[in-house]
């Protein structure tokens, strides 16, 4: 009993032999040789694009640089490295400090190598001040040294008594609560 796949393959080869007059010899390892010249003698050159052994168009290598290397050179040439690194710190704050700390803190801005951070409570601000050295080490490992050299950590903002866009100067301190 023969394999149905082998039978189908032989039928396809027989049909190709009927149409083309020849089929490649599968017993030889010389798959890279040129097909025989036509019976008329001189072989006409075919027009079209050259293709590789798999039939795909050959790559034309011009020595072009990759997009990433071109962007990196341009970033260095324009001096944007520190700005991009600062943006990375702001957008990846949770990755730098962990989910628990990031849940209670927020990066406000980066100015003159200083990272300004606001915390939900004074307790979180105190804890972050204790961890300041470790946070700066992680930032230096991820984005490089001398990008951020100092953390400015603030607690929550006190509530304001002002309401609305306009403000009249107050009358000074009063005995409000008592």
From Swiss-Prot:
InterPro entries: DciA-like, UPF0232_actinobac. Residues 16-55 are annotated as: Disordered. Pfam families: DciA (PF05258). HAMAP family: UPF0232. Belongs to the UPF0232 family. PANTHER family: UPF0232 PROTEIN SCO3875. This is UPF0232 protein Cgl0005/cg0006. It comes from Corynebacterium glutamicum (strain ATCC 13032 / DSM 20300 / JCM 1318 / BCRC 11384 / CCUG 27702 / LMG 3730 / NBRC 12168 / NCIMB 10025 / NRRL B-2784 / 534).
């Amino acid at each position: 009993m023969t394999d149905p796949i082998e039978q189908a393959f032989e039928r396809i080869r027989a049909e190709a032999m009927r149409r083309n007059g020849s089929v490649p010899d599968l017993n030889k390892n010389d798959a890279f040789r040129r097909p025989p010249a036509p019976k008329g003698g001189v072989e006409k050159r075919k027009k079209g694009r050259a293709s590789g052994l798999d039939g795909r168009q050959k790559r034309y290598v011009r020595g072009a640089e990759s997009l990433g290397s071109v962007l990196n050179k341009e970033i260095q040439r324009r001096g944007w490295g520190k700005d991009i690194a600062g943006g990375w710190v702001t957008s990846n704050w949770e990755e730098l400090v962990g989910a628990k700390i990031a849940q209670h803190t927020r990066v406000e801005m980066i100015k003159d190598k200083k990272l300004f951070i606001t915390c939900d409570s004074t307790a979180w601000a105190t804890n972050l001040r204790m961890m300041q050295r470790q946070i700066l080490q992680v930032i230096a490992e991820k984005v490089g040294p001398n990008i951020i050299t100092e953390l400015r950590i603030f607690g929550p903002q006190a509530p304001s008594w002002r309401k609305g866009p306009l403000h009249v100067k107050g009358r000074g301190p009063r005995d409000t609560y008592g």
